[in-house]
Regions:
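Sec/Tat signal peptide C-region and signal peptidase I cleavage site
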Residues: 22-26
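Short, well-ordered loop/turn elements at secondary-structure boundaries
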Residues: 1, 155, 210-211
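Charged catalytic cores and adjacent phosphate/nucleic-acid-binding surfaces used
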Residues: 27-49, 127-135, 170-382
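Bacterial N-terminal signal peptides that target proteins for export
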Residues: 1-12, 20-21
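Intrinsically disordered, low-complexity segments enriched in glycine/proline and serine/threonine
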Residues: 5-7, 85, 123, 376
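A metal-dependent hydrolase metal-coordination microenvironment
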Residues: 29-159, 163-165, 171-173, 178-179, ...
Length: 382
Protein backbone atom coordinates (compact mmCIF):
# COMPACT_ATOMS: atom_id res chain seq x y z
CA UNK A 1 0.00 0.00 0.00
CA UNK A 2 1.30 3.40 -0.89
CA UNK A 3 0.44 4.86 2.53
CA UNK A 4 3.14 2.65 4.04
CA UNK A 5 5.80 4.20 1.85
CA UNK A 6 6.44 7.40 3.76
CA UNK A 7 10.05 7.47 2.63
CA UNK A 8 11.48 7.10 -0.86
CA UNK A 9 14.83 7.57 -2.51
CA UNK A 10 15.69 10.39 -0.11
CA UNK A 11 15.22 8.23 2.97
CA UNK A 12 17.09 5.39 1.31
CA UNK A 13 19.98 7.78 0.74
CA UNK A 14 19.88 8.83 4.38
CA UNK A 15 19.86 5.18 5.45
CA UNK A 16 22.80 4.40 3.19
CA UNK A 17 24.65 7.38 4.60
CA UNK A 18 24.11 6.05 8.09
CA UNK A 19 25.34 2.62 7.07
CA UNK A 20 28.39 4.16 5.45
CA UNK A 21 29.23 5.83 8.75
CA UNK A 22 28.55 2.57 10.59
CA UNK A 23 30.08 -0.22 8.49
CA UNK A 24 29.31 -2.69 11.25
CA UNK A 25 25.55 -1.97 11.19
CA UNK A 26 24.71 -4.82 8.82
CA UNK A 27 27.45 -7.14 10.05
CA UNK A 28 26.15 -7.15 13.61
CA UNK A 29 22.88 -8.76 12.57
CA UNK A 30 23.93 -10.82 9.57
CA UNK A 31 22.34 -13.97 10.92
CA UNK A 32 19.25 -15.97 10.06
CA UNK A 33 16.44 -16.57 12.54
CA UNK A 34 14.84 -19.87 11.60
CA UNK A 35 11.04 -20.04 11.69
CA UNK A 36 10.49 -23.50 13.11
CA UNK A 37 7.18 -24.83 11.87
CA UNK A 38 6.65 -28.56 11.35
CA UNK A 39 6.20 -30.12 7.95
CA UNK A 40 2.80 -31.67 7.32
CA UNK A 41 2.40 -35.29 6.20
CA UNK A 42 3.42 -35.35 2.55
CA UNK A 43 4.39 -31.68 2.43
CA UNK A 44 7.21 -29.34 3.37
CA UNK A 45 6.29 -26.09 5.10
CA UNK A 46 7.71 -23.12 3.20
CA UNK A 47 7.72 -19.62 4.68
CA UNK A 48 6.78 -16.98 2.11
CA UNK A 49 6.22 -13.22 1.81
CA UNK A 50 4.53 -12.59 -1.53
CA UNK A 51 3.98 -8.82 -1.52
CA UNK A 52 6.82 -6.28 -1.24
CA UNK A 53 8.32 -3.33 -3.09
CA UNK A 54 11.69 -1.90 -4.11
CA UNK A 55 12.97 1.36 -5.60
CA UNK A 56 11.80 0.05 -8.97
CA UNK A 57 8.31 1.20 -7.96
CA UNK A 58 7.59 3.07 -4.71
CA UNK A 59 9.82 1.15 -2.29
CA UNK A 60 12.87 2.53 -0.54
CA UNK A 61 15.38 -0.31 -0.92
CA UNK A 62 17.33 -2.12 -3.64
CA UNK A 63 16.15 -5.65 -4.55
CA UNK A 64 19.24 -7.25 -3.00
CA UNK A 65 18.19 -5.83 0.37
CA UNK A 66 14.81 -7.54 0.11
CA UNK A 67 16.57 -10.84 -0.47
CA UNK A 68 18.84 -10.62 2.56
CA UNK A 69 15.99 -9.35 4.74
CA UNK A 70 14.04 -12.45 3.76
CA UNK A 71 17.01 -14.70 4.49
CA UNK A 72 17.52 -13.14 7.92
CA UNK A 73 13.81 -13.51 8.74
CA UNK A 74 13.86 -17.24 8.04
CA UNK A 75 11.90 -17.16 4.79
CA UNK A 76 12.12 -19.63 1.94
CA UNK A 77 10.50 -17.61 -0.85
CA UNK A 78 9.56 -14.05 -1.75
CA UNK A 79 7.81 -12.23 -4.58
CA UNK A 80 8.87 -8.67 -5.37
CA UNK A 81 5.61 -7.14 -6.55
CA UNK A 82 6.56 -3.72 -7.83
CA UNK A 83 3.69 -1.68 -9.26
CA UNK A 84 3.12 -1.88 -13.00
CA UNK A 85 1.42 1.51 -13.29
CA UNK A 86 3.27 3.45 -10.60
CA UNK A 87 7.01 4.12 -10.92
CA UNK A 88 7.71 7.39 -9.06
CA UNK A 89 11.48 6.79 -9.16
CA UNK A 90 11.63 6.54 -12.95
CA UNK A 91 14.10 9.43 -13.19
CA UNK A 92 16.62 7.52 -11.08
CA UNK A 93 16.20 3.82 -11.91
CA UNK A 94 15.25 1.68 -14.88
CA UNK A 95 11.60 1.41 -15.86
CA UNK A 96 12.15 -2.17 -17.04
CA UNK A 97 9.38 -4.06 -15.22
CA UNK A 98 11.48 -7.17 -14.81
CA UNK A 99 14.66 -5.55 -13.55
CA UNK A 100 13.98 -5.87 -9.81
CA UNK A 101 13.34 -9.59 -10.24
CA UNK A 102 16.53 -10.06 -12.26
CA UNK A 103 18.65 -8.35 -9.60
CA UNK A 104 16.98 -10.18 -6.72
CA UNK A 105 17.30 -13.60 -8.33
CA UNK A 106 21.07 -13.29 -8.66
CA UNK A 107 21.40 -12.25 -5.02
CA UNK A 108 19.05 -15.01 -3.87
CA UNK A 109 20.88 -17.95 -5.41
CA UNK A 110 23.73 -18.26 -2.87
CA UNK A 111 21.27 -17.76 0.00
CA UNK A 112 18.83 -20.40 -1.20
CA UNK A 113 15.90 -17.98 -1.40
CA UNK A 114 13.27 -18.61 -4.08
CA UNK A 115 12.34 -15.39 -5.91
CA UNK A 116 9.06 -15.49 -7.81
CA UNK A 117 8.54 -13.18 -10.79
CA UNK A 118 5.53 -11.04 -9.94
CA UNK A 119 3.90 -7.63 -10.23
CA UNK A 120 1.15 -5.58 -8.63
CA UNK A 121 -1.67 -4.48 -10.92
CA UNK A 122 -2.45 -1.09 -9.40
CA UNK A 123 -5.88 0.35 -10.14
CA UNK A 124 -8.40 2.60 -8.42
CA UNK A 125 -11.32 1.21 -6.46
CA UNK A 126 -12.76 -0.90 -7.98
CA UNK A 127 -11.04 -3.22 -8.67
CA UNK A 128 -8.17 -2.05 -6.45
CA UNK A 129 -4.77 -3.73 -6.35
CA UNK A 130 -4.07 -7.31 -7.39
CA UNK A 131 -0.85 -9.29 -7.30
CA UNK A 132 0.05 -11.66 -10.11
CA UNK A 133 2.63 -14.34 -9.27
CA UNK A 134 4.62 -16.74 -11.48
CA UNK A 135 4.60 -14.44 -14.49
CA UNK A 136 6.63 -15.20 -17.57
CA UNK A 137 6.83 -11.51 -18.48
CA UNK A 138 5.36 -8.39 -16.88
CA UNK A 139 5.03 -6.02 -19.85
CA UNK A 140 1.68 -7.40 -21.12
CA UNK A 141 0.05 -6.33 -17.83
CA UNK A 142 0.49 -2.66 -18.76
CA UNK A 143 -3.02 -2.28 -20.14
CA UNK A 144 -5.43 0.66 -19.93
CA UNK A 145 -8.41 -1.61 -19.33
CA UNK A 146 -8.61 -3.27 -15.90
CA UNK A 147 -9.99 -6.56 -17.17
CA UNK A 148 -7.41 -6.70 -19.95
CA UNK A 149 -4.59 -6.32 -17.43
CA UNK A 150 -5.89 -9.12 -15.22
CA UNK A 151 -6.56 -11.34 -18.23
CA UNK A 152 -3.00 -10.77 -19.46
CA UNK A 153 -1.75 -12.21 -16.17
CA UNK A 154 -4.25 -15.07 -16.18
CA UNK A 155 -3.27 -15.99 -19.74
CA UNK A 156 0.26 -16.63 -18.44
CA UNK A 157 -1.06 -19.04 -15.82
CA UNK A 158 -0.42 -16.53 -13.03
CA UNK A 159 -1.74 -16.96 -9.51
CA UNK A 160 -3.76 -13.78 -8.92
CA UNK A 161 -4.89 -12.49 -5.54
CA UNK A 162 -6.61 -9.33 -4.34
CA UNK A 163 -4.49 -7.15 -2.07
CA UNK A 164 -5.73 -5.42 1.12
CA UNK A 165 -9.45 -5.46 0.13
CA UNK A 166 -10.53 -3.11 2.92
CA UNK A 167 -7.73 -0.58 2.56
CA UNK A 168 -9.78 2.34 1.22
CA UNK A 169 -13.16 1.34 2.62
CA UNK A 170 -14.89 3.17 5.50
CA UNK A 171 -13.77 1.53 8.76
CA UNK A 172 -11.78 -0.84 6.52
CA UNK A 173 -14.86 -2.98 5.94
CA UNK A 174 -14.17 -4.80 2.69
CA UNK A 175 -16.66 -4.70 -0.18
CA UNK A 176 -16.92 -7.43 -2.83
CA UNK A 177 -16.96 -5.41 -6.04
CA UNK A 178 -18.69 -6.47 -9.23
CA UNK A 179 -15.23 -6.47 -10.83
CA UNK A 180 -13.99 -9.00 -8.27
CA UNK A 181 -17.06 -11.09 -8.98
CA UNK A 182 -16.21 -11.03 -12.68
CA UNK A 183 -12.57 -12.01 -12.06
CA UNK A 184 -13.75 -14.78 -9.73
CA UNK A 185 -16.34 -16.09 -12.19
CA UNK A 186 -13.73 -16.10 -14.96
CA UNK A 187 -11.51 -18.28 -12.77
CA UNK A 188 -8.79 -15.63 -12.60
CA UNK A 189 -9.04 -14.58 -8.94
CA UNK A 190 -7.57 -17.37 -6.80
CA UNK A 191 -6.80 -15.78 -3.44
CA UNK A 192 -7.23 -12.88 -1.02
CA UNK A 193 -4.77 -11.06 1.18
CA UNK A 194 -6.36 -11.72 4.56
CA UNK A 195 -3.43 -10.08 6.36
CA UNK A 196 -1.62 -7.05 4.95
CA UNK A 197 1.12 -5.71 7.17
CA UNK A 198 -0.41 -5.35 10.62
CA UNK A 199 -4.01 -5.48 9.40
CA UNK A 200 -6.15 -8.62 9.66
CA UNK A 201 -9.31 -8.54 7.52
CA UNK A 202 -12.03 -10.78 9.01
CA UNK A 203 -14.36 -10.12 6.07
CA UNK A 204 -11.74 -11.30 3.58
CA UNK A 205 -11.09 -14.30 5.82
CA UNK A 206 -14.75 -15.29 5.68
CA UNK A 207 -14.82 -14.78 1.91
CA UNK A 208 -11.95 -17.24 1.60
CA UNK A 209 -13.89 -19.78 3.64
CA UNK A 210 -17.11 -19.29 1.67
CA UNK A 211 -15.66 -18.94 -1.83
CA UNK A 212 -12.83 -21.47 -1.48
CA UNK A 213 -10.10 -18.91 -2.13
CA UNK A 214 -6.50 -19.20 -0.98
CA UNK A 215 -5.50 -17.16 2.07
CA UNK A 216 -2.38 -15.01 2.09
CA UNK A 217 -0.51 -12.91 4.65
CA UNK A 218 2.16 -10.51 3.41
CA UNK A 219 4.21 -7.58 4.60
CA UNK A 220 3.61 -5.23 1.63
CA UNK A 221 6.81 -3.65 2.88
CA UNK A 222 8.10 -0.50 1.19
CA UNK A 223 10.71 0.68 3.70
CA UNK A 224 13.58 -1.36 5.18
CA UNK A 225 11.90 -4.26 6.98
CA UNK A 226 13.62 -3.42 10.27
CA UNK A 227 11.81 -0.08 10.36
CA UNK A 228 8.47 -1.90 10.50
CA UNK A 229 9.00 -5.25 12.21
CA UNK A 230 11.32 -6.90 14.70
CA UNK A 231 12.07 -10.52 15.45
CA UNK A 232 9.93 -10.85 18.59
CA UNK A 233 6.97 -13.19 18.82
CA UNK A 234 4.48 -10.41 18.13
CA UNK A 235 6.73 -8.18 16.01
CA UNK A 236 7.61 -10.42 13.08
CA UNK A 237 6.49 -9.74 9.52
CA UNK A 238 3.34 -11.58 8.38
CA UNK A 239 4.15 -14.82 6.60
CA UNK A 240 2.24 -17.21 4.37
CA UNK A 241 3.07 -20.80 5.29
CA UNK A 242 2.77 -22.80 2.07
CA UNK A 243 2.53 -26.59 2.19
CA UNK A 244 4.36 -27.72 -0.92
CA UNK A 245 5.36 -31.12 -2.24
CA UNK A 246 8.97 -29.94 -2.44
CA UNK A 247 11.09 -26.84 -2.01
CA UNK A 248 10.69 -25.27 -5.44
CA UNK A 249 8.91 -22.44 -7.22
CA UNK A 250 6.78 -24.90 -9.17
CA UNK A 251 5.66 -26.64 -5.98
CA UNK A 252 4.74 -23.31 -4.35
CA UNK A 253 2.61 -22.45 -7.37
CA UNK A 254 0.82 -25.81 -7.24
CA UNK A 255 0.22 -25.43 -3.49
CA UNK A 256 -1.24 -21.93 -3.79
CA UNK A 257 -3.64 -22.99 -6.53
CA UNK A 258 -4.62 -25.90 -4.26
CA UNK A 259 -5.16 -23.46 -1.32
CA UNK A 260 -2.65 -25.20 0.96
CA UNK A 261 -1.66 -22.30 3.19
CA UNK A 262 -1.77 -21.06 6.77
CA UNK A 263 -1.12 -17.47 7.78
CA UNK A 264 1.37 -16.57 10.52
CA UNK A 265 0.47 -13.06 11.62
CA UNK A 266 1.28 -11.52 14.98
CA UNK A 267 0.24 -14.01 17.65
CA UNK A 268 -2.16 -15.85 15.35
CA UNK A 269 -2.26 -18.69 12.86
CA UNK A 270 -5.12 -18.46 10.37
CA UNK A 271 -6.24 -21.17 7.99
CA UNK A 272 -8.34 -24.21 7.31
CA UNK A 273 -8.72 -26.87 9.99
CA UNK A 274 -7.24 -29.52 7.69
CA UNK A 275 -3.91 -27.64 7.82
CA UNK A 276 -4.04 -26.02 11.26
CA UNK A 277 -4.71 -29.31 13.04
CA UNK A 278 -1.62 -31.22 11.81
CA UNK A 279 0.44 -28.06 12.21
CA UNK A 280 -0.59 -27.82 15.87
CA UNK A 281 -0.11 -31.54 16.50
CA UNK A 282 3.32 -31.50 14.87
CA UNK A 283 4.37 -28.50 16.93
CA UNK A 284 3.96 -30.26 20.27
CA UNK A 285 5.90 -32.94 22.09
CA UNK A 286 4.76 -34.35 25.42
CA UNK A 287 7.86 -35.19 27.44
CA UNK A 288 6.06 -37.40 29.93
CA UNK A 289 2.93 -38.84 28.30
CA UNK A 290 2.50 -41.36 31.15
CA UNK A 291 1.52 -40.07 34.61
CA UNK A 292 0.35 -41.53 37.91
CA UNK A 293 -2.40 -40.06 40.05
CA UNK A 294 -3.47 -41.22 43.49
CA UNK A 295 -6.62 -39.85 45.03
CA UNK A 296 -6.57 -36.07 44.76
CA UNK A 297 -2.86 -35.83 44.07
CA UNK A 298 -1.51 -33.86 41.13
CA UNK A 299 0.47 -34.77 38.05
CA UNK A 300 2.52 -32.33 35.99
CA UNK A 301 2.55 -32.90 32.25
CA UNK A 302 5.44 -31.27 30.35
CA UNK A 303 4.52 -30.07 26.86
CA UNK A 304 7.13 -28.69 24.45
CA UNK A 305 6.00 -26.14 21.85
CA UNK A 306 8.62 -26.18 19.09
CA UNK A 307 7.21 -23.23 17.11
CA UNK A 308 7.78 -19.45 17.37
CA UNK A 309 4.14 -18.81 18.36
CA UNK A 310 2.54 -19.39 21.76
CA UNK A 311 -0.73 -21.32 21.78
CA UNK A 312 -3.59 -19.97 23.91
CA UNK A 313 -5.86 -22.84 24.97
CA UNK A 314 -9.26 -22.74 26.65
CA UNK A 315 -10.78 -25.89 28.09
CA UNK A 316 -13.97 -27.14 26.44
CA UNK A 317 -14.82 -29.92 28.91
CA UNK A 318 -13.35 -31.97 31.74
CA UNK A 319 -12.79 -35.73 31.75
CA UNK A 320 -14.49 -37.63 34.53
CA UNK A 321 -11.47 -38.38 36.68
CA UNK A 322 -9.30 -35.22 36.78
CA UNK A 323 -9.42 -31.45 36.96
CA UNK A 324 -7.41 -29.40 34.44
CA UNK A 325 -6.79 -25.65 34.07
CA UNK A 326 -9.46 -23.63 32.30
CA UNK A 327 -6.81 -21.70 30.37
CA UNK A 328 -3.34 -22.82 29.33
CA UNK A 329 -0.56 -21.06 27.44
CA UNK A 330 1.88 -23.32 25.63
CA UNK A 331 4.75 -20.88 25.29
CA UNK A 332 6.67 -20.50 22.03
CA UNK A 333 9.91 -22.45 21.94
CA UNK A 334 9.56 -23.55 25.57
CA UNK A 335 8.27 -26.36 27.76
CA UNK A 336 5.04 -25.61 29.64
CA UNK A 337 3.47 -27.44 32.57
CA UNK A 338 -0.13 -28.65 32.62
CA UNK A 339 -1.29 -29.54 36.11
CA UNK A 340 -3.81 -32.36 36.40
CA UNK A 341 -5.46 -33.03 39.76
CA UNK A 342 -7.32 -36.18 40.64
CA UNK A 343 -10.94 -35.89 41.76
CA UNK A 344 -10.50 -38.72 44.25
CA UNK A 345 -13.24 -40.87 42.77
CA UNK A 346 -11.41 -42.61 39.93
CA UNK A 347 -11.36 -46.38 39.76
CA UNK A 348 -7.89 -47.86 39.86
CA UNK A 349 -6.34 -48.73 36.52
CA UNK A 350 -4.77 -47.33 33.38
CA UNK A 351 -6.58 -45.29 30.75
CA UNK A 352 -6.06 -42.48 28.27
CA UNK A 353 -7.31 -39.08 29.33
CA UNK A 354 -8.65 -36.93 26.50
CA UNK A 355 -8.52 -33.22 27.30
CA UNK A 356 -10.54 -31.12 24.80
CA UNK A 357 -9.43 -27.53 24.23
CA UNK A 358 -10.00 -24.71 21.79
CA UNK A 359 -6.86 -22.91 20.60
CA UNK A 360 -8.09 -19.33 20.61
CA UNK A 361 -5.31 -17.88 18.45
CA UNK A 362 -5.54 -20.55 15.74
CA UNK A 363 -8.44 -19.29 13.64
CA UNK A 364 -10.40 -21.48 11.27
CA UNK A 365 -12.91 -18.63 10.79
CA UNK A 366 -13.01 -15.04 12.07
CA UNK A 367 -14.69 -16.00 15.35
CA UNK A 368 -13.74 -19.66 15.62
CA UNK A 369 -10.69 -21.20 17.23
CA UNK A 370 -9.28 -24.63 16.43
CA UNK A 371 -10.69 -27.52 18.47
CA UNK A 372 -7.94 -29.90 19.63
CA UNK A 373 -7.39 -32.76 22.04
CA UNK A 374 -4.45 -33.35 24.33
CA UNK A 375 -4.02 -36.96 25.37
CA UNK A 376 -2.29 -38.29 28.47
CA UNK A 377 -1.91 -41.88 29.62
CA UNK A 378 -2.86 -41.97 33.29
CA UNK A 379 -2.50 -44.72 35.86
CA UNK A 380 -4.87 -44.23 38.78
CA UNK A 381 -3.52 -45.79 41.95
CA UNK A 382 -5.74 -47.18 44.70
Amino acid sequence: MQHQCFVSILSASVALGFLASRPDAFAQNRARTELQFPDLPGYVTLKCDLHMHTVFSDGAVWPTVRVEEAWRDGLDAIAITDHVEYQPNHADVSTNYGRSHEIARVAAEPLGIIVIRAAEITRGEPPGHLNALFLKTIDPLNQTNDEAAVKAAADQGAFIFWNHPGWKQPERKSVWYAAQGEFYDQGWLKGLEVVNGGDYDPIAHQWCVDKKLAMLANSDVHNPIGMIYDSSEEGHRPVTLVFATERSEEAIKEALFARRSVLYAGRQLIGEEQFLKPLFDGALHVKNPDVRIKGKSRALVQVVNRTPISFELERLALPDDVNAPRKITLHAGRTSLIELTGKGSAAAGKRTLVLPFQVMNLKTAPDKGLAVELKVNAEFLP
